[in-house]
Amino acid sequence: MKNCRYILFVAIFVVAIIAQAQVPYTVIANVGEDASTTIRLNWHTDEGSGESVCRYTLADDVNWEYVKEAKARQELCTIFDSIYSKTPDGKDFYEDARFIRNTLEISSLTPGTQYKYYIDGDNTVRYFKTAPTNNNWTATVISDFHAYTPIASRTSAAMNMLSTLEQQRGEFDMVLHVGDIIAWGGSYSFWKSLYENSPFKKYVWAGVNGNHDNMSRGYALQTNQFFANTNNNPLNGYDGEMGVCYHFTYGNTLFIMLNNESMASASGLNKAQKWVREVIANNPARFIVVMEHYQWFYGESGKSSQYDRWKTLFDECGVDLAIAANNHIYARTNALYDGVETDGARGTVYVQTPSSDNERGQALKEWTDNKSLIKSRWSEGGKTVGALMLNATNENLTITLHDRNGNVIDTAVVKCKR
């Protein structure tokens, strides 16, 4: 009897140790290519912790009676290991980051439906929502909060911005980010800390790789793999950009997500633009939205930036809305076609988000360029916090800029052209 009790005790102890080791971290829900029926999850577990399982069901399944489970695909990730970084108290250190990357695509889901899930032995319940089949949905659009554990207030400012919009407008269907959500993308501890915030546990996220997300401290290493390994985006990009550049359909809207860091050269730009043309040709949609990190215009003066590189393609392909960031100043046009403003029946609305970290904003300066194109500029100076709401119907997309208190600063409507 004593031997049986001892064996039972050891078995329970071993199970407890395994369960503890399998608690996931850096968990995020990303969109699937068809966001109405597919979700893609990404999380990390410790080396040697064994297989990892996600259990999910409808959000209103109170007792988890109809739970389903799926095992993750696993691979060792070492891209962040030994990278020079900083601790939350500002001390220099090298990241100790070797872990198992777990990825999972869940398909055959019900459109427009809220689900809940948990992973392994973790008692944290997280949520995601599939896109509707019609075009009635809402998203918040945010960028440039440069999460940096020694200055936690940056992340707090951005998360509070999301909370303010949530309180005023109700829960959104997804969060779109336009890059630079991390100060140094190579600092794994920054990603891990950021993903512990509530919006990462209750929303689906879709974003683009920013220059800060792409770099380690001091630009010692620059790679899109920091972004790729902390997300599980659709693998429908082009060579070298799988899981970084991608596209997805949300309702009746086609989103195309770009990586500026691969488009510095003429050949890199041509490669990206060839892919964009193919995606648009093969994925007919009511609205077409393109997102990249670098700004269309320099908001402080109005001078052209990426607008000059993309306007011809957008005109030819019928892009409805172009969203960018990076400049930390909000700027917005009405619909533009062939370099002039239209009545909205054709052309692209260009918009770029302000920063949201209350620390790294830019002040407006004399408006010297593109006064006939840019309709609105906004900044609070160095301490700027703002974000957009994007509301969709079958007839239009409505973009609204909000300040940190939720006040509406600017609004634009993108008309349906198809």
Describe the residue ranges of each PLM region:
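An acidic-aromatic substrate-binding cleft motif
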Residues: F99, N123-V178, A183-W184
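Bacterial N-terminal signal peptides
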Residues: L8-A16
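Core catalytic region of metal-dependent phosphoesterases/phosphodiesterases
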Residues: T155-S216, E316
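Active-site-proximal segments of metal-dependent phosphoesterases and phosphodiesterases across multiple
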Residues: S262, G268, N283-A324, T342, ...
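Active-site neighborhood of phospho(di)ester-bond hydrolases with catalytic His/Asp-centered motifs
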Residues: T140-S143, M174-D180, W184, W205-N211, ...
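Acidic, histidine-bearing metal-coordination/catalytic regions of metal-dependent phosphoesterases
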Residues: A19-A147, A392-R418
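Acidic/histidine-rich helix-loop elements
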Residues: D60-R98, A139-M159, N229-G237, A264-G268, ...
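Extended active-site neighborhood of metal-dependent phosphoesterases/phosphodiesterases
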Residues: D96-E105, T113-Y127, A131, S189-R277, ...
